[in-house]
Amino acid sequence: MLHNMSNNIHNIASVLTESLSYFQKFQGKTIVIKYGGNAMVDEALKSSFARDIVLMKSVGMNPIVVHGGGPQIGKILEKIGKQSQFIDGMRVTDSETMDVVEMVLGGLVNKEIVNLIHQHGGHSIGLTGKDGSLISAKKLKSDIKPELTSEIIDLGHVGEVDKIDISVINLLLKGDFIPVIAPIGVGKDGFSYNINADLVAGSIAQALNAEKLILLTNTSGLLDANGELLTGLDVNIIDSLIENGTIYGGMLPKIDCALSSVRNGVKSTHIIDGRVAHAVLLEIFTDNGVGTLITCNESGTLITYNEQG
């Protein structure tokens, strides 16, 4: 028993020693985290995520959370008897659906995350992209055509980022708050738009020249056709994986924003397994991490590897 206790103490000491260099390296750095997937619905994972964010802030980092909430939106729509329609993974969003999206993302989900952070000793403020003109949006122009018809589908209030104004984020960081952001923007037409949370997180990370962009997923990272974790890719291989269908569906916007981010000022993007407790801390503060890391080398060639950058 004493031997086991000694081993446990040694392991804890090793982890803390390993983490120290990362605490020092990333002190004062901005980390944008896209929060979604199982980590948002499992109670234990929700708690561990909030603790991770508070610890990051406590050691001098500046975490910024951008969250999704698709399943929660779907549940409320079902309760009011409104059926959801998806085209290529995007929810067709009419005016009534957009009202629900704003209530769920800007209210229910956002404030739950803020409350969890507060429960674990952090100080957080929740907002949508409409607050402080944070996210200027534009309607997503879709050329999606359903099978067997040439009709072009109007996705309604589905948007994309037009511009990011980081003024309100900087005010919150200066006040030592953790920003928690719902991916809703407003267009020049005055309408609200629901935007893919991965793309919002990437746009905010680029605007802030963030040290890292972290995307939580329901997989162990970027996988090959055999389900094995990919840890050494360049941009050409990524393109071929998209072409042959290995990367598809919900992973496509993650890859798009990962590549765009590291091309536009973000030091590294991490696609990690949100099903693992304390995944964010393990990715940032340990040598091996829990996912796939995408970064640029000095020559500007994109590479992907599973080590801390």
UniProtKB/Swiss-Prot annotation:
Its EC number is 2.7.2.8. It catalyses: N-acetyl-L-glutamate + ATP = N-acetyl-L-glutamyl 5-phosphate + ADP. GO terms for cellular component: cytoplasm. InterPro entries: AceGlu_kinase-like_sf, AcgluKinase_fam, ArgB, Asp/Glu/Uridylate_kinase, Glu/AcGlu_kinase, NAGK-C. The record marks K34, K254 as: Transition state stabilizer. Transmembrane segments: none annotated. GO terms for biological process: arginine biosynthetic process via ornithine; L-arginine biosynthetic process. Pathway: Amino-acid biosynthesis; L-arginine biosynthesis; N(2)-acetyl-L-ornithine from L-glutamate: step 2/4. Gene3D superfamilies: Acetylglutamate kinase-like. It comes from the Bacteria. Substrate binds at G69, G70, R91, N194. Keywords: Amino-acid biosynthesis, Arginine biosynthesis, ATP-binding, Cytoplasm, Kinase, Nucleotide-binding, Transferase. GO terms for molecular function: acetylglutamate kinase activity; ATP binding. The keyword ATP-binding applies. It is found in: Cytoplasm. Catalyzes the ATP-dependent phosphorylation of N-acetyl-L-glutamate. Belongs to the acetylglutamate kinase family. ArgB subfamily. This is Acetylglutamate kinase. The lineage of its organism: Bacteria, Pseudomonadati, Pseudomonadota, Gammaproteobacteria, Candidatus Pseudothioglobaceae.
